[in-house]
Amino acid sequence: MTLTLYSMPSSGNSYKVRLLLAHLGRAYRHEGMEYGTEELARAHAEGTLPFGKLPVLVLEDGTPLPESNAILCFLAEGTDWLPADPVTRARVLGWMFWEQNQHEGTIAVRGALRTYAHRAHLATPERMVALLDQGHAHLERMESHLAGHDWLAGDGPTVADIALYAYTHTAGEKGGYDMDRFPAIRAWLDRMAALPGHVGLTDIP
């Protein structure tokens, strides 16, 4: 039995896992589902999604692993994507916690409000302005760090870079953020896309 990934092709959180699996060269079966589909309703009904959301990675023995960043850490264990050095690993995890606690709540949310029809009614002018301002502030934090470093943590790419790449690389197109303000981020995005094994958001196996 091989790995099975339940994922939403349009979602950055699901994309993180597909991207790392591609970099690791791991074979897996992909079960894609979007909002409003029968597949997603069935996954909920059958209890496939432990926390009620995607992605979920089901291991060879049938064990389900929810939460994108937890899955990244599991898959990356023992590789350079998750450094063994305790200090470097803590820095990696710090960026990943920040991604879920701060970055995703603005960058991803604003993109979702502009992208998914069933969320359009939540996109009030006041909320969209607030998300734009907060998102730019979060991008500025990344810009400040990347202006002096090629990668977010350590001397090479880690799962921290994958976690932040997923929603940052579509922040301009989906979220309407002004990425011209962030040359260091744009250079980092180019470095990520140039890595061997890279796959795009729409590259579904």
Residue ranges and their predicted role:
Residues 1-129:
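GST-like domain detector, emphasizing the conserved glutathione-binding G-site
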Residues 32-33, 86, 158, 184, ...:
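Proline- and acidic/polar-enriched loop/turn elements at helix boundaries
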Residues 70, 184, 197:
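Residue-level recognition of oxygen-bearing side chains
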Residues 96-193:
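GST-like fold's C-terminal all-alpha helical module
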Residues 191-192, 198-201:
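Charged phosphate-binding loop/patch that engages nucleotide di/tri-phosphates or the phosphate backbone
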